Amino acid sequence: MPPSSAAEGSTKRKKGGAAPHLKSRSKNARKLKRSAEDAEIAQLEQGIQAFVSPIDLKQFTQLPLSDRTCRGLKRAGYTDMTDIQAKSLSLSLKGKDVLGAARTGSGKTLAFLIPVLEILYRRKWGPSDGLGALVISPTRELAIQIFEVLRKIGSYHTFSAGLVIGGKDVKQEKDRLSRINILIATPGRLLQHMDQTLGFDTSNVQVLVLDEADRILDMGFSRTLNAIVENLPRNRQTMLFSATQTKRVKDLARLSLQDPEYVAVREPENEGCTPRGLEQHYMLVELEKKLDLLFSFIRTHTKCKALVFMSSCRQVQFVHETFCKLRPGVSLMALHGKQKQAKRLQIFTQFTKTQHALLFATDIAARGLDFPAVDWVIQLDVPEDVDTYIHRVGRTARYTAKGNSLLFVLPSEEKGILEALATKNIAIGRIKPKESKTQSIQNQLQAFAFQEPQIKHLAQKAFVSYVRSIHLQKNKEIFDVTALALEPFAAALGLPGAPKVKFVKEAAKAKKAAAYKAAQQQADDNSGQVKGDSDDEQAERADKNGKVRTKYDRMFERKNQDILSKHYANLIADDASSEQDSSNDSDTSDDDSVSVATTDNDDAEDREETRYGRSAGRRKENRLVGSDTSDSEEDESDDEQNDSGLHKIKSETKRSVMAARGDGDDGFLTLKRADHALEDDGDAYGIGGDDTRITMEQAKADATENLSKRKLAMGQSKKALALAGKRGIGEKLIFDEHGEAHALYELQDEEAFNKQGDAKTQAQRWAEEERERMQQADAKDKELAKEKRREKRRRQKEREKALERGDAPDNGDEGGSGDDDEEEEETGGRAVLAPIDNRSDGYETPDFDLTTEEDEDDDDDADDDDDDDDEAYRAPAPKRRKMAPSAGVTSQPSHSKKSKLEQEEELALRLLAGDA
């Protein structure tokens, strides 16, 4: 066959398909391939079950892995295993739940990706089986990094893998989710697809992996993770990996782990959780000097790769913008959460490939990201906790490489952060900057802020965001916002003054209150140790200082506030009388002397009342007997005033009783003012100097004699009355059948109330009386409504009959004149049912009776009264079309007022005449 024809034949076979013998050969090949895979899978299952981890487990070839996975690892350059990989793979390959903890850069990504590939391969997972493995990452950059590693080591497998993160096209992701076997996602976007994407089924997931598990399980992703786990099957395999692994039972119970195996790479006791090749330093810096030292460090380290962490996105933006204008001589980049996903991915890739660069970033770059050859990690702000510090410094000194870290610490933060790092056995040394190489950039920043409003606005945002980040930190022993020098810090950012931040004042106030409370508690504790204090008193004092006492608490804690002075005086008088009866014969001389002395005191009081008016005497009496009128704010003062008031009442009452006794027995126990009136009595307000009764009006007149007109006007003003609670209070009286006045809402005493029966019986009686009264009133209303309906129906029928006869209704009772309507209006316009219309709905041809002009005038006069009743309810008659007079019909003269029937008859005649 010529070459051309051979070429054509080969082309035809490609278009038409393989030859029959080739089809059979490929079918046999696929069959052999499947049988070989089945044999390999069976061998792997046996090897996994019988595998015992040797002591010298160093290479991946020692593990019972599939040939495809081994080739992928070899192609990616992974031959030797790390400690965490050697300890965890032997457990995870058997299908057990694993909690893995190891230092940063120790190869945790391969420790969970290899079991994912092997488990799905051994279970013959295919495209029709759906989603089989789910890997959740806290950040987008870490998810991208995991996906790239999976592509390298799984290149020989036939699984379909997908990446689902925020910032991507959701519609494009929805179309491909149903065909994915291994999914790597961030929590937020994964939950969004679970809620919105049709056909996305997670009920058959075999493996769940949480990378940086402690970050995913904390409060930031708590609710999202709970919602995701609810949609996953319980018989899955779960693996958790992090540099700072959690052991909290609450977190582990949420994931429904089944007998998890905790795998941790034990470090020597003298080493911490940070990489071995990491040198850690800290520098004591004032807040306003941070940017100067950072810029000086960059100027002196232009041939290195560094990562600078800050606490907020606004700080990253401001420092990146201003330092780029200062041109330090090295490539500067910024990575923070306010950037678009495409920009974040571009910067992540660019910094990974660049040899000498400096990246300003927030904590989104602190976890899991593997930046190659990072020389320095600089922390411009102290991290929130030790775990964050470990993850930050873990971006350098990866695996066996070397690295350095530098932490800028404020003087107020030094003690707290060093103690926190010591709890994790992290040794950090202090270094001092060289003054000769320190360069100030404050003047340049001020010039930038003055020339460009955007830079000034960004500086203000950076200032506020930093202060807010310090204020929101939980550990107040390290982060004290009140200790920050805000004015110098604002000047260091180039601002003319510090922006006003409200929560700084609130924090200062709270700190002052906490210090005062601590001092008060300390004083109470010291006073509680004094001798003589009982346990009850100490407990009561602790209860008072332990909670805030409101005015209601003080009100309910008052004691002896309801003692009646008059009743108590009578009791004391009875005691005094019994004592006098027993000692009447032996103490006559003493009684006389006491009586004379008491009489002199009474005369002195009368003279004082005459000199200063009746009000002075009453004030003096109230001062002696007024224990029930005191309203103290503290319990101790209440008790003291009550006790003193009771002693004064007792002494004064005894003195009055002894003075009231005369020489004979007739004057025994005659009190001078025993039945004096109180302030509420209007008819007898007090007793005068000559034992005469004074009315309330006279007492008020005496009290207002010494007041000026201005004071009197002020006392009667609306404001004064409102403050006294007397404004708007009216006294309403009702008179009974005997002519006696009673208050409108007069209260009965208990005795009078019980005479009428108990409360339940009276309530039932009142309900029955009201029910009966309402029934009677209802019957009257119904009867009245029926009568009105009957009357209206009768008048309507009479009016219709009169119209049928052609007679005008009279103004009497039968015609239904306007007097009845007026009478209805005067009754109050009670609503009644509409009258029943008994006329037929069809049209009735009227009898046309032509009358003379005189008859029409008479009829008009007779119908005026009837038409007046309907004027208010009938609209004016519409204008009728003028028609030409025809032969045989005389034109009728126009009248100002015509009845409705006559107008209809006239219109009918005109229409008939026109048709004729």
UniProtKB/Swiss-Prot annotation:
Protein's UniProt keywords contain Hydrolase: yes
Biological process per Gene Ontology, one example term: rRNA processing
Binding site for ATP: 102-109
GO cellular component: nucleolus; nucleus; small-subunit processome
Gene Ontology terms for molecular function: ATP binding; ATP hydrolysis activity; identical protein binding; RNA binding; RNA helicase activity
Compartments, as annotated in UniProt: Nucleus, Nucleolus
Sections of the chain in a coiled coil: none
Motif (Q motif): 58-86
PROSITE patterns documented for this protein: DEAD_ATP_HELICASE (PS00039), HELICASE_ATP_BIND_1 (PS51192), HELICASE_CTER (PS51194), Q_MOTIF (PS51195)
Function: ATP-dependent RNA helicase required for ribosome biogenesis. Involved in the release of U14 snoRNA in pre-ribosomal complexes. Required for pre-rRNA cleavage at site A2.
Free-text domain note: The Q motif is unique to and characteristic of the DEAD box family of RNA helicases and controls ATP binding and hydrolysis.
Protein name: ATP-dependent RNA helicase DBP4
Gene responsible for this protein: DBP4
